[in-house]
A protein has these predicted regions:
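Basic, Lys/Arg-enriched alpha-helical interface segments
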Residues: 1-64, 73-79, 88-91
Length: 91
């Protein structure tokens, strides 16, 4: 099991998502628990590595327009949640 760290950017974005009421927080928590357990996400989440300057990061689609950006520190068993939001919010 990975220890989960939330960046300040992630916390701010999550707060906005909660205030919007557009998504169920339980959906986000479910995906984070799967990732933190080290299990592979189901295909429907379209989990993949990013490219270019963000190649150390991964991205998955919690919902079609809700993306989670994260990375692992495998040596210390840490999962860092970097940001969450729509494509236009993140990129």
């Amino acid at each position: 099991m990975y220890y989960v760290i939330l960046t300040s950017r992630y916390k701010k974005s999550l707060r906005k998502i909660k205030e919007s009421g557009r998504y169920y927080i339980s959906d986000i928590e479910k995906v984070v628990k799967i990732i933190a357990s080290g299990k592979k996400l189901d295909e429907k989440y379209r989990d993949h590595s990013l490219t270019g300057s963000m190649s150390e990061y991964r991205e998955c689609h919690i919902k079609s327009d809700l993306l989670l950006v994260y990375y692992f520190n495998h040596n210390e068993l840490i999962l860092v949640l970097v940001n969450i939001g729509s494509h236009s919010d993140l990129f």
